[in-house]
């Protein structure tokens, strides 16, 4: 369970004694100026602690016990190892009888391998390698140490191996270099000899789906409190496999270490989904800056991508790759922006650029590769290069086609001229649609719990861009993307092609959002990438240094004439932010073949650091500079600062020397050394009364401040006067606050007068994170401006700010009173905020009385602004140079001589907002630095926190402090997922890892290695870590979060549990569920700080037997949601949900429309099509109370609130398959085999159905008959589609809800016994009405054949079980049924009492299944009048026998299947008879499926019940697909679900059924889920004729009718190409019947079909066209398996099979193996030679139409028995489906049929077709097997585009109906004639007779 925070050392030590980390040094402070080498060292020191170890943590940290351990090893006794070669459950066993009492059973013991003398390192070594030798020696010691739990050998082993001392399993011995006879030492683990705890453990897995809950359970079950070592194989629950690939101890790789409570597991997937986005910006066509002669795109396609794919191939990973090219095209209409506003808002455009010339633009996306296996990287690169040739042309000319006029005339001519004037070109990368692409990629997998792929884990998005890592974005897009990525587990990697820039990356620059009420004033701000120093109006937040480009004078001089120098609108405030969810890297070229990763706070790579310190490389290429001959070899003119002889270099260098001990000043005060780089040019000042920098200097020492001041005085000479403009602006500066009164135009609740980016003002920010303090917090005031700024600041201005537990540092350093830059009077503001109210306390300075505090209400009706709030490390624009140097807000005006800075508190919601000067009630969201480590706070005259709380409470009671606002400002909304800083000068020494990487922090073992990182992240993406250390600070937690509490307790009446769950188990379930939903456990001291406590009792998540007691909590977070799970009241779990407040509304800009309208061209599209996506729709909040109640057992219904996993499967009927099960009776046709396969599956489902304990108890205490299996699955088989059956036979359908069977309710007879059977009495009982306990007997139709007064074998089996006391199961009942059959020989002899019933066709013995039987003539009762609606002699029969069953009421009993009258009907709603009218007000309800709880862990490998909900069809047509759907919520291991599905697939494959996963949504709706996929439309070249076929049978009659079904010809085409029905459209069902499934109502718009291979879906639209879509859920690993097996089978068949074996009617020389021979789960289906057994459903097997050699018109219908996939010549050039060469199966030599019995006579003609490409019979197999969907699509399209073939096909359909007229007269099963020329009745009537 969750570990406690690391500041609770006692708990840590008691939990795992002796655990220690590696070396953890507290490195000294570095001062501001340092060289590049010292810069590197400081980075190493900054990262020396393990991630998350804060200085405030009180955890005990021990040194690595290398020296102490080695000394002990020399004196300890050695023991001998014996290797256990057999399979052992225990890894290490100790013979404690020989070892002694030093080691107790159950204690931790370390096994150290004693080095041999030859392995010891040499004693002499170079001194400079001393540290390396020390580390290597320590590592060597660690590598040979194995820690285990001591366990004594069993007595039998001791008796057998009496001399064995240490018994080690072989895999452990191999990993630690132990052999038989190896000497080891045994050392108990205690505080003197601690175990070396691993900081990170990496595990890799492949070909399986692991949820994060699975990862947690695996870590706890197999890794926790054990030694882990590199190469270790981990097997969890016997099915989940993973391998330990790396072990880290404090960032250093180790061979092994102990997995303790602080160890962080990192799971990496080698079978993930990759989406590669390539930004085709304008720079992609530019030449490389390095002068290599390559354009950018060539570097991508010839450099990076081949290197990436080769890495994948070397690691043998199995990823699915999707590649999308995206670009933004800007349009220059040739007129000014003002005049072009109307055209800019044309519906064609996606939006309008907010920068530069505000050009309209259109976003384009081109899908090049869609979910292709990573092994086919050569095809991927070829497709990329091919698409590159056309991409630029397509996107540049698309507007001419999309905007072309539709009408003719003069207007259209003028519009065409205007279109030709429009200039279209790709935008620069900085202005591209970068965020939109990421947002769309994240939407791809936002619902990954639907259609769950059980073979892949993880999604990784890689964006390849020609940008150096800088993007200008819209605030809205950044906020949406940030919120989307903060809550999912998608990793985003940015690969930049240019060189690494000199500033921090990745960088997003955006304008502050404009809130309603703010005045927007247009002012051109140049944000072009080509800005030069000559430009006066500069970009805020750019890459220039603060002292240069952003000096106040330059900005003032850049003001245009007539433009006021007052405050500009917030739209022109630029903010530079770094996202936490984006990891950037730079492709450095093919020579290095490695990625140079750019850390957030690191600005240069190693290659740059190798340059001499006095050489400055020019990194930007400007045209003006190049024309002035400024080349790379020129030296910079300005000398470095330290080369000046006047510069106090020695003082600066001396100040960088670390001081290990605290010093005392002259007054005896403690001088605490800095733990980070000082934030100002001078050292920290500790006095608060006056500015005295020399106060703390030592006697006789000149302070560094004084030396730097002298240097400034020497070099800087201020001008003696100022010009008029400066004087006027200074005056305006002073008068602006008075003019503004209570106005506020800034989104942050602060306004300002002059936007001079003096960095001193940026110190007004409240406390920043101790790890990531942006550069802007350092005081870097240019000396030239110091006095002028002081002169301008002689007025005290109201300042809106917020203050956590201490005041902002800059406020404590500088006062802006009339004293200029002096030390402010002591004042500290504290804030203590609760959810109900919030406020802050004000500390009065000694020089001011409480009378100076005044409360000023704001103007009624005016919208107050929020005070400044910055969110966790992402201080947004307040830290950027665009922010106000000094913020002024309306408030009380103090005298000008006041040294204090009044801070206004404002309320956004209350009209009379009370304002309290002095501090803000709104705390910043920046993480507070540890209070104990802040010397300014500890050693000042600040007020105590408890006193401040008292003062605050008194003010709160007095009503002086308003409530907190209910919304957050737009700036705060981006925090803490963005880090705002000055990109050109970041603070490199204060990087908060929890802030920097947020969710991904614990993935990186060594953060300091981010500059150069290999390919691990790109080759095997990591899952979101289980733990995180980020937690909001106390102030932001109280001010920005709302609390929602509730309690959860276990439902003790839950039926699913044998024993109710304990609270520990319930808590584990709640934690596991949240893990699977993306939550992370929060560890570290941040939680305790946020709650204002020294420590918080938290559970240890990685402990196996950690007992939960009241008061223990677990904190979990995801995005803006925090959950606190606490144990309370002995048995309950209290859940506190903290949700961040919503973002404050603001007016959207005109360039951000509500709907995003890009142009997308999918893989198969011929052109771009504009699509609309709603990216603004808010995400629905989840009802966690309901979810937790479901886990606790209070409800068991899976609803959409739960976001449960779900997957849909179909069983596709295959042709030419035989059952390979031993003992299967011969004589079954294909249809009967498939039905038998479904029955076997149903028995498996029934066997492993989860039975609740109460039912089990009833079965245990009930009679014998209660234990019998009564087959409750109750599947009804029909030979028509469900819609037709419901419309025609509603009343007799047992699926009808609200009805009740009365069978077995009346029993007036004694039960029978198989020992003494009276056949007459038994026959009488069988033939009773169903209400009286008889067997259901009725007329049944199967296809076109009618059987009178018959029953079904499964019904009889259930009846025998119910009426015989001595039958135990269905097998015995089936055996009894066989005894009751009439034997064939007895019937021929005419003997009496030979049996009760016979098979209707006399082909089968009695079997439990869908077999029809009739009572023999001897015992058959005469039918009373009205028993049947039709007489036997009639040729036509109505479909619904009305007198068969009396009306029923109540709910039907589905204890056994009940067959119904069968008949045929057209596949259309036009001739479908209406269902019987329901009573007024209520529709009859029909449920087509049923759900059961299925146990996926019947082998009991888990510690808890593992259940899924299995939905199965109850009404099934064997010609169509059988549907399955599984839903699950909290299964322990997802691999259990996959194992069950594989078992089902294996079982079904032996009965001619293929199990394939298909999407839950229909094919036409794929674009709503995946914007980069679209169904492919195929139109018919010739529309189908309106004339109907001559003969067609109505469902109510056998007489020929002339009413064809709607889309009759389209369905015939699909059946011709081996498509079978998957799901009917909702409109097909009768409108007067309430039809539903167990999972919901039918919602398909079109009827969907699926190919028998399972690889492609097809739909028929309302206008008669086809929509085709590849089934990407079809498991890709089946392709390779089928390819290998087919090639092998082909080789074998060529050698062994003779010409007489093959396809019937074709007699091919080889047995063709179709691609459908293998299932998605690599299960081969039997493929014996086809025989001439009867086929009851000819519609499934299209029979070749044999024609003479001279017949060409029938060629289109001469398709072979096989799938069209195996006929590649139809797609070959020059060959059309209508040609003679397309007849038959290409590549096969057909021999004439020599009169096979029962077959129509074939011609003697021999048709020979060459294989495509001229190869042999198997030449094409290896290429098209992986392209099944493309082959099927191409073949179907070629046929539909061939007008001659279509017309011939239509004629065939019309004339084929004539052949069926005799089928009704013969009285036998008339075969389905759709598309095939001859009647099946002719072929099989002779045999059946």
UniProtKB/Swiss-Prot annotation:
Domain DEP: residue ranges: 1331-1417
Molecular function per GO: GTPase activator activity
Compartment(s): Vacuole membrane
Region described as Disordered: 1-74, 515-540, 551-570, 716-808, 838-900, 1252-1272, 1424-1484, 1724-1824
Predominant location: membrane
Topology in membrane: Peripheral membrane protein
Keywords: Membrane, Vacuole
Family matches, as CDD domains: DEP_DEPDC5-like (cd04449)
Biased composition (Polar residues): 47-60, 747-766, 787-804, 840-853
Biased composition (Basic and acidic residues): 729-742
Bias kind Low complexity: ranges: 865-877, 1737-1789, 1801-1811
UniProt cross-references to SUPFAM superfamilies, sorted A to Z: Winged helix' DNA-binding domain
Any one biological process term the GO annotation gives: intracellular signal transduction
Family recorded in the similarity comment: Belongs to the IML1 family.
Official protein name in the record: Vacuolar membrane-associated protein IML1
Organism in which the protein naturally occurs: Chaetomium globosum (strain ATCC 6205 / CBS 148.51 / DSM 1962 / NBRC 6347 / NRRL 1970)
């Amino acid at each position: 369970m969750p570990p406690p925070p690391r500041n609770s050392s006692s708990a840590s030590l008691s939990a795992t004694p002796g655990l220690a980390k590696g070396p953890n040094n507290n490195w000294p402070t570095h001062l501001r100026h340092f060289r590049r080498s010292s810069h590197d060292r400081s980075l190493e020191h900054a990262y020396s602690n393990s991630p998350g170890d804060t200085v405030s943590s009180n955890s005990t940290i021990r040194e690595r016990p290398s020296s102490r351990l080695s000394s002990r090893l020399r004196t300890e006794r050695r023991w001998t190892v014996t290797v256990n070669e057999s399979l052992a459950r225990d890894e290490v066993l100790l013979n404690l009888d020989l070892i002694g009492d030093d080691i107790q059973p159950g204690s931790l013991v370390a096994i150290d391998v004693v080095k041999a003398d030859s392995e010891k390192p040499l004693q002499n070594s170079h001194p400079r390698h001393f540290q390396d030798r020390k580390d290597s020696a320590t590592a060597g010691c660690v590598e040979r140490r194995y820690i285990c739990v001591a366990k004594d050998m069993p007595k039998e082993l001791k008796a057998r191996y009496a001399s064995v001392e240490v018994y080690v399993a072989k895999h452990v011995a191999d990993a630690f270099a132990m052999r038989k006879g190896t000497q080891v030492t045994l050392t108990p683990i205690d505080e003197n000899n601690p175990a070396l705890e691993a900081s990170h453990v990496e595990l890799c897995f492949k070909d399986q789906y692991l949820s994060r809950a699975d990862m947690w359970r695996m870590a706890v079950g197999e890794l926790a409190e054990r030694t882990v070592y590199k190469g270790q194989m981990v097997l969890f629950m016997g099915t989940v496999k993973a391998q330990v690939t790396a072990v880290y101890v404090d960032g250093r790789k180790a061979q092994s270490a102990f997995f303790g409570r602080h160890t962080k597991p990192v799971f990496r997937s080698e079978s993930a989904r990759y989406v590669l986005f390539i930004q085709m910006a304008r720079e992609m066509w530019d030449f490389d800056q390095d002068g290599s002669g390559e354009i950018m795109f060539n570097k991508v396609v010839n450099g990076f991508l081949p290197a990436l794919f080769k890495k994948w191939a070397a690691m043998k990973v199995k990823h699915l790759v999707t590649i999308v090219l995206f670009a933004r095209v800007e349009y220059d209409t040739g007129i000014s922006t003002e005049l072009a506003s109307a055209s800019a808002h044309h519906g064609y455009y996606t939006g309008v650029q907010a920068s530069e010339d505000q050009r309209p633009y259109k976003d384009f996306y081109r899908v090049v590769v869609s979910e292709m296996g990573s092994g086919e990287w050569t095809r991927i690169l070829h497709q990329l290069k091919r698409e590159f040739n056309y991409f630029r042309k397509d996107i540049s000319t698309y507007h001419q086609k999309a905007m072309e006029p539709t009408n003719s005339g003069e207007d259209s001519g003028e519009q065409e001229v205007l279109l030709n004037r429009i200039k279209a070109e790709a935008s620069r990368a900085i202005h591209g649609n970068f965020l939109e692409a990421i947002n769309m990629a994240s939407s791809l997998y936002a619902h990954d719990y639907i259609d769950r792929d059980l073979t892949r884990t993880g999604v990784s998005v890689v964006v390849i861009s020609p940008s150096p890592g800088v993007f200008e974005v819209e605030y809205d897009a950044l906020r949406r993307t940030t919120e989307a990525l903060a809550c999912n587990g998608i990793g985003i990697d940015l690969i930049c092609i240019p060189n690494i820039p000199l500033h921090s990356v990745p960088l997003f620059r955006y304008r502050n959002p404009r809130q309603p009420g703010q005045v927007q004033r247009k002012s051109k701000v140049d944000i072009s990438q080509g800005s030069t120093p000559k430009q006066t109006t500069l970009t805020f937040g750019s890459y220039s240094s603060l002292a240069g480009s952003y000096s106040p004078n330059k900005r003032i001089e850049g003001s245009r004439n007539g433009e006021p120098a007052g405050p500009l609108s917030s739209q022109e405030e630029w903010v530079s932010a770094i996202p936490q969810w984006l990891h950037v890297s730079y492709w450095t070229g093919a020579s290095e073949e490695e990625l140079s990763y750019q850390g957030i706070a690191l600005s240069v790579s190693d290659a740059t650091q190798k340059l001499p310190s006095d050489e400055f490389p020019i990194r930007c290429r400007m045209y003006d500079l190049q024309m002035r001959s400024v080349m790379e070899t020129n030296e910079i003119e300005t000398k470095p600062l330290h080369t000046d002889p006047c510069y106090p270099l020695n003082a600066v260098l001396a100040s960088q020397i670390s001081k290990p001990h605290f010093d005392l000043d002259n007054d005896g005060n403690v001088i605490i050394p800095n733990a980070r780089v000082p934030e100002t040019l001078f050292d920290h000042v500790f006095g608060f009364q006056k500015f005295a920098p020399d106060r703390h200097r030592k006697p006789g020492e000149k302070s560094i401040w004084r030396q730097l001041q002298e240097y400034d005085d020497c070099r800087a000479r201020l001008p003696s006067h100022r010009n008029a403009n400066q004087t006027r602006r200074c005056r305006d500066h002073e008068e602006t606050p008075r003019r503004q009164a209570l106005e506020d135009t800034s989104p942050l609740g602060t306004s300002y007068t002059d936007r001079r980016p003096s960095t001193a003002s940026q110190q007004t920010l409240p406390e920043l994170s101790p790890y990531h303090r942006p550069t802007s917090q350092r005081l870097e005031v240019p000396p030239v401006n110091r006095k002028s700024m002081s002169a301008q600041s002689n007025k005290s201005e109201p300042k809106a700010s917020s203050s956590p537990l201490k005041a902002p540092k800059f406020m404590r350093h500088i006062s802006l009173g009339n004293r200029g830059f002096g030390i402010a009077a002591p004042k500290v503001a504290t804030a203590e905020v609760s959810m109900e109210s919030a406020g802050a306390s004000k500390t009065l300075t000694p020089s001011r009385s409480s009378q100076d505090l005044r409360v000023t209400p704001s103007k009624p009706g005016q919208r107050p602004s929020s005070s400044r709030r910055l969110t966790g490390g992402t201080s947004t624009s307040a830290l950027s140079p665009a922010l106000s140097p000094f913020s002024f807000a309306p408030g009380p005006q103090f005298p000008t001589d006041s040294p204090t800075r009044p801070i206004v508190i404002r309320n956004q919601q209350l009209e009379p907002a009370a304002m309290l000067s002095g501090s803000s009630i709104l705390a910043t969201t920046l993480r507070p630095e540890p209070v104990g480590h802040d010397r300014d706070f500890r050693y000042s005259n600040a007020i105590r926190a408890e006193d401040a709380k008292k003062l605050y409470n008194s003010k709160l009671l007095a009503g002086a402090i308003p409530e907190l606002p209910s919304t957050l400002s737009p700036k705060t909304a981006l925090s803490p997922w963005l880090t705002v800083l000055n990109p050109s000068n970041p603070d490199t020494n204060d990087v908060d890892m929890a802030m920097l990487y947020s969710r991904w922090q614990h993935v990186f073992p060594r953060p300091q290695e981010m500059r150069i990182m290999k390919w691990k992240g790109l080759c095997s993406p990591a899952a979101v870590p289980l733990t995180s250390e980020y937690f909001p600070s106390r102030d932001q937690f109280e001010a920005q979060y709302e609390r929602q509490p509730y309690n959860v307790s276990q439902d003790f009446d839950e039926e699913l549990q044998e024993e109710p769950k304990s609270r520990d188990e319930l808590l584990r379930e709640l934690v596991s569920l949240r893990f699977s939903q993306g939550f992370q456990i929060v560890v570290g001291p941040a939680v305790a700080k946020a709650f204002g406590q020294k420590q918080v009792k938290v559970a240890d998540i990685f402990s196996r037997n950690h007992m939960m007691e009241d008061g223990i909590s677990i904190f979990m977070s995801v995005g803006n949601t925090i959950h606190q799970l606490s144990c309370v009241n002995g048995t309950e779990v209290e859940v506190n949900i903290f949700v961040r407040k919503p973002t404050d509304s603001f007016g959207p800009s005109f360039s951000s429309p509500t709907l995003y309208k890009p142009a997308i061209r999918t893989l198969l599209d011929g052109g771009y099509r504009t699509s609309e996506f709603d990216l603004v729709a808010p995400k629905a909040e989840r009802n966690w109370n309901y979810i937790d109640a479901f886990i606790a057992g209070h409800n068991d219904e899976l609803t959409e609130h739960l976001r449960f996993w779900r997957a849909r499967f179909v069983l596709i009927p295959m042709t030419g398959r035989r059952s390979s099960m031993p003992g299967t009776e011969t004589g079954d046709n294909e249809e009967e085999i498939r039905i038998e396969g479904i029955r076997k599956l149903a028995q498996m489902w029934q066997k492993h159905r989860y039975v609740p304990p109460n039912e089990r108890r009833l079965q245990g205490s009930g009679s014998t008959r209660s234990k019998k299996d009564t087959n409750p699955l109750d599947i009804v088989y029909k030979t028509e589609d469900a819609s037709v059956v419901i419309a025609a036979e509603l009343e007799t359908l047992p699926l009808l809800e609200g009805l009740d069977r009365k069978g077995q309710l009346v029993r007036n007879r004694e039960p029978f016994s198989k020992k003494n059977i009276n056949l007459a009495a038994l026959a009488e009982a069988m033939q009773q009405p169903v209400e009286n306990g008889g067997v259901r007997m009725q007329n049944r139709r199967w296809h076109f054949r009618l059987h009178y007064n018959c029953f079904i074998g499964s019904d009889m089996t259930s009846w025998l079980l119910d009426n015989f006391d001595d039958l135990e199961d269905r097998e015995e009942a089936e055996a009894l049924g066989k005894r009751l059959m009439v034997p064939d020989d007895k019937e021929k002899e005419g003997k009496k009492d030979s049996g009760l019933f016979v098979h209707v066709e006399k082909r089968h013995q009695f079997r439990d299944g869908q077999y029809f039987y009739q009572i023999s003539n001897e015992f058959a009762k005469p039918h009373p009048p009205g028993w049947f609606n039709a007489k036997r002699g009639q040729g036509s029969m109505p479909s619904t026998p009305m007198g068969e069953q009396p009306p029923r009421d109540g709910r039907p009993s589905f204890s056994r299947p009940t067959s119904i009258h069968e008949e045929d009907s057209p596949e259309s709603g036009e001739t479908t008879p209406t269902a019987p009218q329901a009573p007024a007000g209520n529709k009859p309800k029909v449920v087509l499926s049923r759900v059961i709880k299925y146990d996926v862990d019947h082998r009991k490998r888990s510690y808890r019940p593992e259940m899924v909900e299995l939905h199965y069809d109850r009404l099934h047509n064997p010609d169509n697909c059988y549907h399955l759907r599984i839903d699950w919520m909290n299964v322990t291991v997802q691999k259990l679900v996959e194992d069950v599905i594989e078992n089902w697939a294996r079982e079904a494959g032996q009965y001619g059924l293929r199990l394939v996963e298909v999407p839950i949504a229909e094919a036409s709706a794929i674009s709503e889920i995946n914007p980069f996929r679209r169904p492919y439309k195929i139109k018919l070249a010739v529309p189908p004729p309106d004339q109907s076929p001559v003969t067609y049978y109505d469902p109510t009659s056998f007489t020929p009718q002339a009413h064809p079904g709607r889309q009759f010809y389209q369905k015939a085409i699909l059946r011709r190409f081996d498509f079978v029905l998957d799901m009917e459209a909702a409109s097909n069902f009768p409108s007067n019947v309430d039809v539903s499934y167990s999972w919901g109502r039918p919602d398909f718009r079109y009827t969907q079909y699926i190919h028998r291979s399972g690889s492609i879906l097809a739909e028929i639209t309302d206008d008669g066209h086809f929509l085709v879509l590849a089934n990407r859920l079809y498991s890709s690993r089946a392709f390779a398996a089928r390819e290998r097996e087919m090639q092998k089978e082909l080789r074998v068949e060529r050698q062994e099979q003779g010409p007489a074996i093959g396809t019937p009617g074709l007699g091919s020389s080889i047995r063709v193996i179709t691609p459908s021979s293998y299932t998605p789960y690599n299960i081969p289906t039997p493929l014996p030679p086809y025989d001439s057994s009867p086929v009851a459903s000819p519609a499934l097997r299209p029979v070749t139409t044999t024609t003479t050699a001279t017949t060409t018109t029938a060629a289109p219908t001469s398709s072979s028995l096989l799938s069209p996939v195996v006929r590649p010549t139809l797609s070959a050039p020059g060959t059309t489906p209508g040609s003679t060469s397309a007849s038959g199966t290409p590549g096969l030599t057909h021999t004439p049929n020599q009169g096979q019995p029962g077959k129509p006579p074939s011609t003697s003609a021999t048709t020979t077709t060459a294989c495509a490409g001229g190869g042999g019979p198997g030449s094409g197999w290896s290429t098209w097997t992986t392209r099944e969907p493309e082959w099927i699509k191409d073949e179907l399209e070629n046929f539909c585009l061939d007008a001659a073939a279509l017309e011939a096909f239509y004629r065939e359909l019309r004339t084929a109906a004539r052949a069926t007229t005799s089928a009704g007269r013969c009285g036998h099963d008339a075969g389905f004639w759709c598309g095939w020329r001859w009647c099946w009745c002719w072929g099989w009537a002779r045999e059946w007779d």
